[in-house]
Amino acid sequence: MDILQKIMQQKAQEVAIRRGQVSEAALLQRVKYAPPTQGFAHALLSRAQQGQNGVIAEVKRGSPSKGRIYPEHLAWQPAQIAESYRANGAACISCLTDETFFMGHDAFLQAIRAAVACPVLRKDFLYHSYQVVEARSLGADAILLIMAVLETPQAQELEAAARELGMDVLVEVHDERELEQAHELKTPLMGVNNRNLKTFVTDIETSFRLAARMEKGRLAISESGLNTPEDLARLNEAGIFSFLIGESLMRGGEPGGALAQLLGREVV
């Protein structure tokens, strides 16, 4: 069993427990009190149309492949990290909510959404409509759909549920088959994960290959393995101006400063 299968097995157990604690109908009631959605897709599309880099900066404490990423001796303050990202040029924020494998938590997303005027993505492994409603109740402006764990009809149902709640959808692919499936969705946001989620091997060439095969009107978003301004410049040459970056920003303990350096900006 690879790591992705383990994660999805855990998610099935997690969702079953949560549905037993709070019904989907009760969650929908909570949605009424959630802050209104901010334009996640618009924040990225508007920058890309102007030839400007749009970064989804990720609040990421750890991962299955790297263990703890954010330095252990520093206080963990997700809202402050997200605000530092915003101040240093992030277009959007991504927040991991998976506890078991990525050291995330729903409360991190809630804290970020309450404190930061920036669209927020719930980064998790979604497969059930319950998780979509849950994302909106937490204040998410967008959700991630990973085609490696979803069949096309399932992804379409989740996308429709998200849109009904006013959220945008970022669909993530890693190969040609997944891209073909993703083209069946309506969202313009196409994330290309340079990291193979089954082996965790990273190759930035994946972004070049798949972006070239995308339908017109889709926005390629390069994810994982982006470490230097040169990486971004190479992708810019191929017409890619949108990125999801986390690990390389979090590792040094000053995520906002690391983002500013990556974007060639003055650190705020």
Curated annotation (Swiss-Prot):
It is an enzyme of class 4 (lyase). It comes from the Bacteria. Pathway: Amino-acid biosynthesis; L-tryptophan biosynthesis; L-tryptophan from chorismate: step 4/5. One of its GO terms (biological process) is L-tryptophan biosynthetic process. InterPro entries: Aldolase_TIM, Indole-3-glycerol_P_synth, Indole-3-glycerol_P_synth_dom, RibuloseP-bd_barrel. One of its GO terms (molecular function) is indole-3-glycerol-phosphate synthase activity. It catalyses: 1-(2-carboxyphenylamino)-1-deoxy-D-ribulose 5-phosphate + H(+) = (1S,2R)-1-C-(indol-3-yl)glycerol 3-phosphate + CO2 + H2O. Its EC number is 4.1.1.48. Pfam families: IGPS. Keywords: Amino-acid biosynthesis, Aromatic amino acid biosynthesis, Decarboxylase, Lyase, Tryptophan biosynthesis. The keyword Lyase applies. Belongs to the TrpC family. PANTHER family: INDOLE-3-GLYCEROL-PHOSPHATE SYNTHASE (PTHR22854:SF2), TRYPTOPHAN BIOSYNTHESIS PROTEIN (PTHR22854). This is Indole-3-glycerol phosphate synthase. It comes from Magnetococcus marinus (strain ATCC BAA-1437 / JCM 17883 / MC-1). The gene is trpC.
